[in-house]
UniProtKB/Swiss-Prot annotation:
GO molecular function, one term: lysine-tRNA ligase activity
Binding residues annotated for Mg(2+) 2, in chain numbering: 417
Enzyme class of the recorded protein, top EC level: ligase
Binding site for Mg(2+) 1: 410, 417
Record-stated family: Belongs to the class-II aminoacyl-tRNA synthetase family.
Protein name per UniProt: Lysine--tRNA ligase
Lineage: Bacteria, Pseudomonadati, Pseudomonadota, Gammaproteobacteria, Alteromonadales
Amino acid sequence: MTEQVQDENKLIAERRAKLDSIRPNCSANAHPNTFRRTHKAAELQEKYGQNTKEELEALGFRTSIAGRIMAKRGPFLVIQDVSGRIQAYAEKGVQADLKDRYQGLDIGDIIGVTGQLHLSGKGDLYVNMEEYQLLTKALRPLPEKFHGLTDQETRYRQRYVDLIVNEESRQAFVMRSKVVAAIRNFMIKKEFMEVETPMMHVIPGGASARPFITHHNALDMPMYLRIAPELYLKRLVVGGFERVFEINRNFRNEGLSPRHNPEFTMMEFYMAYADYQDLMDLTEELLSSIAIELLGSAQMPYGEHTVDFGGPYARLSMLEAIQKYNPDNATIQAMTYEQVKDLEFMRELAISLGIKIEKFWTCGQLLEEIFGETAEWQLMQPTFITGYPADISPLARRNDDNHFITDRFEFFIGGREVANGFSELNDAQDQDSRFKAQVDAKDAGDDEAMFYDADYITALEHGLPPTAGQGIGIDRLVMLFTNTHTIRDVILFPAMRPQA
């Protein structure tokens, strides 16, 4: 047992003893629930922070505050609530028995304080502790003030402690809530209807990914946590709801990285009588408006860069982007779509770039890998990448002028994908053929290929109007708005391996 653990165990034992000493003197409960707060810290600061000491004395304003003790310096306590911090003073006018009990208070305890509001000589508001009540005794100590909670893994495993002691973490999740609310309000103003579709699917679909598998006991059948809501949302468009959106969780049984968590949040939406160009325009409007609403500017810092959401955003085909970011590669500079269709050419090109290829990869998959390795990470400013091959876009409508590619885009900021959208494939026969090609790919070893969904084909046979749809990764978007570089910093409880 380390010295640090021994010290912590000693503190826990001391705090338990303090709680045990309190219990016999409590007529009802050592964890009372009768205290009522009248003001939060920020409310008092906003309303009375500009008053002079004399004005507050004359006002004689009495208040009740509640929160967690974050510091204890002689007769002064620093109390933190959801809105901020305020001090309490346990000296002037405090009853003798309360002073005695004051000595038993520890940093981390949750208390309620009632008394008159004053201004200290340093200009800080404080509440004189005429009355106080211990509401919850903290049995474990908080991390030391100057060392803090710096271990990243502990921050993720014990997010509750992280939120108590790290203002930056609290503000990141406040911003996350604001981003989601702003997106929801924007979509509702654009006459989209918010819906909820199943989280457990009989057939996983809507994206190329490995699903999580579970078992439905009552039906005695396997089911899958959804990898995307797409096929259900498009069924709703078939049913006549012309504009729908959903903000919810998706689950993909894949690896962990600074950009990936198996459980993540998406906003997915569909609009009838629109195409992928309309989606790009709407995305520009959405992101620029929420940036200005939440940050007061369309520009925001991200690492060493300044990201400009003001628009218009760059629009490049995947082939154009590869050529732009490989200016010294003569083969790439001369490459045409006819060559992209040549499997051997694409394999040789990928290998020459140091890419480890899979034998079942198609021309489109090879093009996407080349893009990902050489161009994607350089897309710092908002950029739409178009021209995705049909063989990696099984749900997207083919381009009218070039049937090898689809009317699809992915949206990149800060060197990572944030959104994916396209004009929807509403040709039931073409969709049937592409599902069958996905089944063949799965049989060849691609475990991320899609399943065949016969009911979705039936839905398309009833008629899906011309439609465009898009998914936006909420977690990655929040990373931008909070200037953080790992997805775990914007997910309250990220996936972690259990501790031994």
